[in-house]
């Protein structure tokens, strides 16, 4: 199965995206939740056999250290632990400022380029806004959290034999058929019925394709809420 997703520019870019979902000051975000979402994203890439760059793995090991120390009983305050968290948040804040400046400069460059040359036409589905201001990466991050929960359930089922012959076209047809009957379904409900991780992945990719083609419509009422598929646009 050949899968292509637009990646973040680096681990700090991913962390900034996760932190920004909370709509609060960087230093007030629930750091353990952010770490868990980052690790879920990395694990999902690995399950889907997508390449994970070394700097992402290095950051993952650092985040796991922070998380483990956070979850330990606090008999004595760990100054080193606080330093690790503070250093991480400062790096995210610094990257946020750098990215804002970079985007402003890029916008100015694009404006000037309009006067001197024909704009280059690009079609990048992986970074496209789908519906309700949701991008493919927004849905993928939500999916990675669901995937983590599903992996935990399947680990307790030792009788399941993995298949690798799920066809995206078949899954698309199955989702459309179900929507004909129910009009509205949540991806979580569909995933609960899956017996293997390959089946979960295939259904997710089929959903993305249906959304891209505007055959079904996607809705997510909150940043970390359920992913809802609708037969008709709300």
Curated annotation (Swiss-Prot):
Gene3D superfamilies reported for this sequence: 6.10.250.2410
Annotated GO biological process: cell division; chromosome segregation; DNA replication
Major location category of this protein: cytoplasm
Cell division as UniProt keyword: yes
Keywords: Cell cycle, Cell division, Chromosome partition, Cytoplasm
Stored InterPro entries: ScpA (IPR003768)
Source organism, top-level taxon: Bacteria
Pfam families for the chain: SMC_ScpA (PF02616)
Record GO cellular component, one term: cytoplasm
Location within or outside the cell: Cytoplasm
Oligomer and partners: Component of a cohesin-like complex composed of ScpA, ScpB and the Smc homodimer, in which ScpA and ScpB bind to the head domain of Smc. The presence of the three proteins is required for the association of the complex with DNA.
Protein family (similarity comment): Belongs to the ScpA family.
NCBIfam families: PRK00104.1-2
Full protein name: Segregation and condensation protein A
Source species of the chain: Streptococcus pyogenes serotype M3 (strain ATCC BAA-595 / MGAS315)
Organism lineage string: Bacteria, Bacillati, Bacillota, Bacilli, Lactobacillales
Gene name for this UniProt entry: scpA
